[in-house]
Amino acid sequence: MKLRTSFFNFRVLLKNITRFAPLWILYAVGEVLGLMSLDLENEAAQIANDLCCLMGPVSVFHLVYALLVAACLFGDLFDGRLCNGLHAMPLHREGWLLTNIASGLVFALIPALAGGGVAALFLEKYWWIALVWQGTSLLQFVFFFGLAVFCAMCAGKRLGMVAMYGILNFLSMLILWVVTRLYEPLLPGVVISEFWFAKLCPVLSLFGSDYLDYTYDKILGGIFRGFIGESLRYLVICAGAGVVFLLLAWLLYRKRPLEKAGDFVAFRPMGAVFLLSYTFILGVLLYTFGDLLGSYRDYGFLAVGMLIGWFTGWMLLERTVKVFTKKVLLGLVAFLVFFVGSLGLTLVDPLGIVTYIPKTEEIASASMYLENDIHNYDSDSGWDGWYITDPEEIAWVQELHQTMMHTPQSAGNMEGKNYRAHQLMYKLGNLDMSGQEYITVYVQYRLKNGMEVYRTYRIPVQSQAMEGLKTFFSDPRAVFAVTDYQKMKENIRDVTLYWGIEDEMILYSDAQQQELMAAIEADCEAGTMGQHAFFHGDDDYVADIDINWNAVYKMGQMGDISGIRGDYVIVYKDCINTVAYLEDLLEE
């Protein structure tokens, strides 16, 4: 008579719960103690706020806990005798797998219930936040556990499982690291955006997520405005990905050869993924170390690191040191040809990425700003960059961009047309720029189709491009870090002049204030008022001008709030109109 297939075995579940009780008990106790470490003497609204702030960071603990749970439950697959003995028992593979998956979920449910139950005792009317805590914890665990089970099916030993778990969790950031270290320097000015790489790394995204729009106020108490849909959607997608990994693990387990127990990987394709990842990681690690030493050593260390990674990776996969065979050497040659070819193709840039400048009619707005400017480019100061929409001013940005693109960013007498080769010379030789100082310029275009283009350039202070930059950043909007200069000028409250060590003068008269602003505007028009120190000589400082004006701050949902905003302007010797006005003022 044909035996009925069972997809679940309750006895195995109970055995797992008792066999690995120390693991889930310790985690449950740790979660309870962690929640008890909060200041429970605070009022319930404050405790609720603390709990909301922990929902994202606690994902790191689920990352490790899920790996430990999967390693314990599926550890029998990594030992030859245990693996063969297990599969000789009258228990179907599907039944054993699904029972272990259910055991893992129980191992997550018990700590979540314990921690949430303890938290609910102190949350009073905010008890429902404990339920949100439990839900987010379980969904985070489902993703990491699903990935860990998938890695367990792909690996033949625990070390291989841990290696693949780490690589897959941080794969996008590892790719970003390799690209920014090896390929980005060959594309002068190009900046690889981290946004999508971070989005594809759940460890980072879950860690920084807030799931509730909840704030605490000492007077109003807890203020709940709703759930943060974007974070919850991302969490649900991750949990869904965890379920997909569990399904893939089930498909792999049905085909898993028992003789692979003890091998580094159980399936050959995963061996290729591990070998390439391991080789690149080790190569870039040594490359980074060599880059610190300089003088041609970075690429030498890269080659050594890749050689070590390739052969030691094969040793792990083959479980032998006898890997110096024709097959392995031919694979190494093919890998190096592909790698060097990709570097050469990046350097040649057949797609014209380096020289790409959007057309004026494609641009919605453009922005250009400097690193280490005296102004604070953030929303708190009311200034989040100078976004230009006027077509003529956008064309000005494009012209400066074109000039910077063809300005050598290293020492020497290379012509602009050879700037890309010159970049490689600088990278290979790690030259010291002949002692020149550099200014970092950021260019950003927001296109009408929603895309954004970023470029970053390191411009020598002595280059011709500095003159154009100095003129551009002498615009009053850049000098005072405001988007509406005329409105700022009309609302000035007071002006204070500082020079020397203790000398100062306050201008109370509207006439004096407007005369000073007229002198500053004249220097802005002349292109000499740029505020970055590299636009002027080392000994050109004359005075500071501290200006306060009435401003309106946009506070989002709280509306607009009136207040006072201040900024200061540095006067240098080449600001001849402002210097002349200050001299006349001091003589009066």
Which residue ranges define each predicted feature?
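Terminal transmembrane helical anchor/hairpin motif
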Residues: 40-50, 174-266, 284-303, 354-360
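Hydrophobic alpha-helical transmembrane segments
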Residues: 1-80, 245-258, 270, 282-296, ...
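Central hydrophobic cores of alpha-helical transmembrane segments
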Residues: 27, 159-172, 306, 326-339
